[in-house]
């Protein structure tokens, strides 16, 4: 009897529904190829949640997610909702509460450049020849984004804005284990990012990470200040395997690493809780400027679905098959507009045609 997994499908706004449709078609192909069944329940989130149910994260959506084994998330946001109070806007009103409700503390963002796409990168060919594969692991529920106190006080020109950067030993320990366990399955290197020369929270971070590293003698640990890391990512990204960051540093460096690949439309992400539950989403935004035109790149959404198979459902072979199918399609020259360079052998395709090609390769 086929194993059954429950998936909460949250397409969201902008290009979200279009790229989600292709990911679900690839999921159909996985069902046909492997002895497994995916029960999918769609729910509103972000701007769609605001328009249809009055808030970015409706209670119905939360309940659907609670009943699921994983969340497959599209993208949220757009100009239509930018005039709302910040806490009610799609991004802050949906993503931050989802992370808190489900304890999604570990964000995994691969920054991969395929050898056939090195020309799309902003870096020189000699720096990235042969491609690179970096995994940024970001602590997602602590640090300056969440710690108290924070706020704005006073009147007029006497107003003061303040935030608190705070980390506990258990918070640092659990994200460090995620990084070292990931490195064991990759290049066996962890570079921990901090600002221990000026921040007390970073002093503790470095101390705890160094202690945990002793449990993983087969993995090489290095430390790097965040300003140097930002420079080194551009100078020589191949030096990195797994990059371990606290929340704000990871937010910044993961975007930088992503852009080195040439397109955010290529990059998946996973946000994991303790256990097997996770939320999987593309690294890019809702791209409202191209929504509805059928030209969005669905690869990030499809690879995010592949990460769901690997991390929440233990289907490593299926996840690898999806990764290989994407690489095959790129080697065959299929390109959506964002990665099209008008080179010989390239074939410009739309969203659905890219999905068709990946399904055929799978």
From Swiss-Prot:
Binds 1 Mg(2+) or Mn(2+) ion per subunit. Transmembrane segments: none annotated. NAD(+) binds at residues 78-91, 285-297. GO terms for cellular component: cytosol. It catalyses: (2R,3S)-3-isopropylmalate + NAD(+) = 4-methyl-2-oxopentanoate + CO2 + NADH. It is found in: Cytoplasm. One of its GO terms (molecular function) is NAD binding. Keywords: Amino-acid biosynthesis, Branched-chain amino acid biosynthesis, Cytoplasm, Leucine biosynthesis, Magnesium, Manganese, Metal-binding, NAD, Oxidoreductase. Its cofactor is Mg(2+); Mn(2+). Mg(2+) binds at residues 227, 251, 255. The record marks 145, 195 as: Important for catalysis. InterPro entries: IsoCit/isopropylmalate_DH_CS, IsoPropMal-DH-like_dom, Isopropylmalate_DH. Gene3D superfamilies: Isopropylmalate Dehydrogenase (3.40.718.10). Its EC number is 1.1.1.85. It holds the Pfam family Iso_dh. Substrate binds at residues 99, 109, 138, 227. It comes from the Bacteria. Pathway: Amino-acid biosynthesis; L-leucine biosynthesis; L-leucine from 3-methyl-2-oxobutanoate: step 3/4. GO terms for biological process: L-leucine biosynthetic process. Belongs to the isocitrate and isopropylmalate dehydrogenases family. LeuB type 1 subfamily. HAMAP family: LeuB_type1. NCBIfam families: leuB. Homodimer. Catalyzes the oxidation of 3-carboxy-2-hydroxy-4-methylpentanoate (3-isopropylmalate) to 3-carboxy-4-methyl-2-oxopentanoate. The product decarboxylates to 4-methyl-2 oxopentanoate. This is 3-isopropylmalate dehydrogenase.
């Amino acid at each position: 009897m086929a194993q059954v997994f429950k998936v909460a499908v949250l397409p969201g706004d902008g290009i979200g529904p279009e790229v989600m449709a292709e990911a679900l078609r690839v999921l159909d192909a996985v069902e046909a190829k492997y002895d497994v069944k995916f029960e999918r329940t769609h729910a509103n989130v972000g701007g769609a949640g605001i328009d249809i149910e009055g808030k970015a994260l409706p209670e119905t959506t939360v309940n659907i997610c609670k009943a699921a084994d994983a969340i497959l998330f599209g993208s949220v946001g757009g100009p239509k909702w930018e005039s709302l109070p910040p806490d009610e806007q799609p991004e802050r009103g949906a993503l931050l509460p989802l992370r808190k409700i489900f304890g999604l503390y570990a964000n995994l963002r691969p920054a991969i450049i395929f050898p056939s796409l090195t020309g799309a990168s902003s870096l020189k060919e000699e720096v990235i020849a042969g491609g690179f594969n970096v995994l940024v692991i970001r602590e997602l529920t602590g640090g300056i984004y969440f710690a108290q106190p924070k706020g704005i006080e006073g009147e007029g020109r006497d107003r003061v804005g303040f935030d608190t950067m705070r980390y506990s030993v258990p918070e640092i320990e659990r994200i460090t284990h995620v990084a070292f366990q990931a490195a064991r399955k990759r290049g066996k290197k962890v570079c921990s990012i901090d600002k221990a020369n000026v921040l007390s929270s970073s002093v503790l971070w470095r101390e705890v990470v160094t202690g945990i590293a002793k449990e993983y003698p087969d993995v090489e640990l290095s430390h790097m200040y965040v300003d140097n890391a930002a420079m080194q990512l551009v100078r020589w990204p191949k030096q990195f395997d797994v990059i371990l960051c606290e929340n704000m540093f990871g937010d910044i460096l993961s975007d930088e690493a992503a852009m080195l690949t040439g397109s955010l439309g290529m990059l998946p992400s996973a946000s994991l809780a303790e256990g097997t539950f996770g939320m999987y989403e593309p690294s890019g935004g809702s791209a409202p400027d191209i929504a509805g035109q059928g030209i969005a790149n669905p690869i990030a959404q499809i690879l995010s679905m592949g990460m769901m198979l690997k991390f929440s459902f233990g289907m490593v072979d299926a996840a690898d098959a999806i990764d290989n199918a994407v690489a095959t399609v790129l080697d065959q020259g299929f390109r959506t507009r964002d990665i099209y360079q008008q080179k010989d052998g390239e074939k410009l395709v739309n969203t659905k045609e890219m999905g068709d090609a990946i399904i055929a390769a799978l």
